[in-house]
Design a protein with these regions (language model features):
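Conserved N-terminal subdomain of the carbohydrate kinase-like
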Residues: 34-55, 69-124
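Glycine-rich phosphate/adenosyl-contacting loop at the front of the ribokinase-like
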Residues: 1-78
Length: 124
């Protein structure tokens, strides 16, 4: 089967919290989803810089195309990435997953999603 998807190219940055206290410190409610600006993202990631982190390509369409590829289907992804290191990571990760990628590259930053994972597994 040949399938191509068009979607948002987002890199998921997963941070494992030692406890939930840090959420109060940075003013975020546990389990909430908030759209934040670049400055807020940098402040959060700076505050949590010492925590273990994992980076993975994300976005629902990309995740579906990667899953299809892992099941043996020919899949492709169309999206927009920035001309930055995170965009390069995204492109490389899709290639390694066997997903043909077709990107529009801009001078801006690649989109990202910061996910803080509490010890009980809840995502914020």
């Amino acid at each position: 089967m040949n399938t191509i998807g068009l979607g948002n190219a987002l890199v998921d940055v997963l941070l494992r919290l030692e406890n939930d206290d840090v959420l109060s410190e940075i003013g975020i409610q546990k389990g909430a989803m908030d759209m934040i600006n670049r400055e807020q993202m940098i402040a959060i990631r700076t505050t949590l810089a010492g925590l273990p982190r994992t980076q993975t390509p994300g976005g629902s369409v990309c995740n579906t195309m990667r899953s299809m590829s892992s099941l043996g289907a020919n899949s492709g992804f169309i999206g927009k990435i920035g001309d930055d290191s995170i965009g390069g990571f995204y492109e490389d990760a899709l290639e390694k997953a066997g997903v043909s990628s077709y990107f529009i590259k801009t001078d801006g930053l690649t989109g990202s999603c910061t996910v803080m994972i509490s010890p009980d597994g809840e995502r914020t």
